[in-house]
C-alpha cells in the first residue's frame, strides 16, 4: 500500500466515472475517480483527486478531517441504513473512522472510538504538499480495509462474493486563503467559512451523505479483474426505494404535525 496504482492488477481495474456534485446537477471543477479491488483478506480502494493546490493541516487521528480537503468512503454492508461505516482521510494521510448506529436524522449515537483494526493507508502527491509557490496536479490515496472488521455489520461471516453492498464515495473541497505560505479555509466578509464543495460517486440529491438509501451498489464479482460484469439491481431493492419514500413522507408529516399520518 503506497498510494499508487502501478501494479498490474490495479492497472487492469477500471476507474469509476468522474464524481459529480452531491445534488447531482453541477459538474465539479476538479476531477475525482475511484477504483476498487478485493481478495479474501481485504477490500482495496484507490482514488485519484485532481487539484492545483494540495494542502492539509490536520494530523490527529479521529479529528474532523473534512475541515481539510479530503476523500471519504461510506459503507453499509447489509443495506439497512443502520450500523454503517464512515472513513475520511486527507493529504497528510490522517484518518477518521467511525461507526454510525443509525443516520444522524434518528439522533442515534456515533461510535467515534471505533477503529478499523489492520487498516492500511497511503497518500501519493503528484506535486507538492502545502507549498503555494507552484501548481500541483493531483493526489492519490490507496486504502486496504480488512474483511474481518467490515463483516461485523454485514450479518454474515462470509466475504460478499458475487453479492453487493451499499457504498458511496465523497470528496470535500474548500476554497482556500493564504497567510504567507499557510493554507486555510476561505472566509467571507463577515468571517464565516465559505461552504464546502461536495463531490460524490453516486449523487445523493441533497447535501447530506448520511442518507444511506441513496448510496450506490458495489458488486463483488469473482470473475477476473479485466472482465466486465453485468449487474442488475434486484427487484427487492426497488421495493425498498418506495418504502423509503413513504418513510421520508412520514418523517416530514411528523415534523410538521407532531404525529404520524394514519
Whereabouts are the PLM-identified features?
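Short, glycine/small-hydrophobic-rich surface segments
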Residues: 245-262
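Structural preference for beta-rich elements and adjacent junctions enriched in aromatics
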Residues: 1-247
Amino acid at each position: 500500500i503506497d498510494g499508487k496504482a502501478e501494479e498490474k492488477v490495479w492497472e487492469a481495474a477500471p476507474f469509476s466515472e468522474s464524481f459529480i456534485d452531491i445534488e447531482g446537477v453541477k459538474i465539479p471543477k476538479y476531477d475525482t475517480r475511484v477504483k476498487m479491488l478485493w481478495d479474501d483478506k481485504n477490500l482495496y480502494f484507490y482514488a485519484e483527486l485532481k487539484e492545483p493546490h494540495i494542502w492539509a493541516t490536520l494530523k490527529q487521528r479521529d479529528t474532523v478531517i473534512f475541515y481539510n480537503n479530503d476523500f471519504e468512503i461510506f459503507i453499509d454492508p447489509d443495506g439497512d441504513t443502520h450500523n454503517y461505516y464512515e472513513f475520511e482521510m486527507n493529504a497528510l494521510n490522517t484518518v477518521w473512522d467511525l461507526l454510525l448506529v443509525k443516520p444522524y436524522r434518528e439522533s442515534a449515537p456515533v461510535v467515534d472510538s471505533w477503529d478499523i483494526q489492520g487498516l492500511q493507508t497511503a497518500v501519493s502527491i503528484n506535486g507538492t504538499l502545502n507549498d503555494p509557490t507552484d501548481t500541483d496536479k493531483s493526489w492519490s490515496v490507496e486504502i486496504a480495509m480488512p474483511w474481518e472488521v467490515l463483516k461485523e455489520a454485514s450479518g454474515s461471516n462470509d466475504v460478499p462474493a458475487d453479492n453487493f453492498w451499499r457504498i458511496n464515495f465523497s470528496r470535500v473541497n474548500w476554497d482556500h486563503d493564504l497567510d504567507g505560505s499557510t493554507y486555510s479555509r476561505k472566509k467571507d466578509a463577515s468571517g464565516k467559512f465559505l461552504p464546502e464543495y461536495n463531490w460524490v460517486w453516486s449523487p445523493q440529491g441533497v447535501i447530506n451523505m448520511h442518507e444511506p438509501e441513496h448510496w450506490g451498489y458495489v458488486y463483488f464479482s469473482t470473475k477476473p479483474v479485466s472482465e466486465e460484469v453485468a449487474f442488475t439491481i434486484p427487484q427487492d431493492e426497488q421495493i425498498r426505494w418506495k418504502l423509503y419514500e413513504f418513510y421520508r413522507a412520514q418523517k416530514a408529516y411528523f415534523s410538521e404535525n407532531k404525529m404520524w399520518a394514519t
